[in-house]
Amino acid sequence: MDYPTLLLALLHVYRALCEEVLWHTSVPFAENMSLECVYPSVGILTQVEWFKIGTEKDSIAIFSPTHGMVIRKPYAERVYFLNSTMASNNMTLFFRNASEDDVGYYSCSLYTYPQGTWQKVIQVVQSDGFEAAVPPNSHIVSEPGKNITLTCQPQMTWPVQEVRWEKIQPHQIDLLTYCDLVHGRNFTSKFPRQIVSNCSHGSWSFIVVPDVTASDSGLYRCHLQASAGENETFVMRLTVAEGQTDNQYTRFVTGGTVLLLLFVISITTIIVIFLNRRRRRERSDLYTESWDTQKAPKNYRSPISASQPTNQSMDDTREDIYVNYPTFSRRPKTRV
């Protein structure tokens, strides 16, 4: 092998090792794990093949409705399929006694008629769980049947190169949409749920989950990356339950109602206390004035009414008479 050929071969191996593999679903490694592969459309299944992706594709198993199932020797004792699922386009691969060597990327390729080839890539990673490692930035609560829009907008002003939306569950992460804005490529999702998204140049991104149900509850992550390596991540929790609404709006309305009620109660209490004190003061002043009027001495005689009978006893009409007279000095007379 000449030098240029060797260099090209090494370059090919390097690119294969370093190039990021776009996956549809990521699952944590376990000794007994399952790699889900369910074809969502209706079609005639002609062949299914599983591969492990490394520097090369390593065939694990192949299935044909005509020729049956063949599992390659390195995996014959460690993987299996459920017979009950093979007739319904469900070619989920099950592992038993898996080892750390089984960490990596796997590909499930289905050949159907008349749709053609359908492929799903699954990543197996070392992880204890996914939800605990990503605390949400916000929480959205909704009733079933609504269309929910999830939005993320970066704080920085750098141009966005890649946008990735994911749904995070304890047992797996599903890629909802991937946009390569530089090369104009959109990665087709294999998520078994219709998700509407925008893949256009801009400073923000959104997805729409139409007609939500309880199964749509969970964490949703938006990852934005720039060409220079800058990146931002937003995590939102969606809860779908009967009789629930957006908790932020509910808290706002409830808080405003409580504050308004407290304000009305305070104003009413102040007015009632003020009126009670005013009435007490008025009653006290009236009582004092009446009492002083009754105790005041009279220095006049009330005239006799002309309507009184003339033969009325003088004793009955007798009243106290007060006469003002000068005060005379009582000095003793001087004797001559």
Curated annotation (Swiss-Prot):
Gene name, per UniProt, is CD226
Spell out the residue ranges making up region: Disordered: 298-319
Spell out the molecular function terms from Gene Ontology: cell adhesion molecule binding
Membrane topology according to the record: Single-pass type I membrane protein
The record's listing under SUPFAM superfamilies reads: Immunoglobulin (SSF48726)
What's its job? Cell surface receptor that plays an important role in the immune system, particularly in intercellular adhesion, lymphocyte signaling, cytotoxicity and lymphokine secretion mediated by cytotoxic T-cells and NK cells. Functions as a costimulatory receptor upon recognition of target cells, such as virus-infected or tumor cells. Upon binding to its ligands PVR/CD155 or NECTIN2/CD112 on target cells, promotes the cytotoxic activity of NK cells and CTLs, enhancing their ability to kill these cells.
PANTHER family xrefs = CD226 ANTIGEN
Transmembrane regions: 255-275
Positions bearing Phosphotyrosine = 322
Q: Which residues lie on this side of the membrane: Extracellular?
A: 19-254
Please give the residue ranges for the topological domain Cytoplasmic: 276-336
Q: Which organism is it from?
A: Macaca mulatta (Rhesus macaque)
- The name under which this protein is listed is CD226 antigen
Q: Which residues are glycosylated?
A: 32, 83, 90, 97, 147, 186, 198, 231
Got any disulfides in this one, which pairs?
37-108, 152-222, 179-199
* Single GO BP term: cell adhesion
Question: What are the record keywords, sorted?
Answer: Cell adhesion, Cell membrane, Disulfide bond, Glycoprotein, Immunoglobulin domain, Membrane, Phosphoprotein, Receptor, Repeat, Signal, Transmembrane, Transmembrane helix
Report if keyword Nuclease is assigned: no
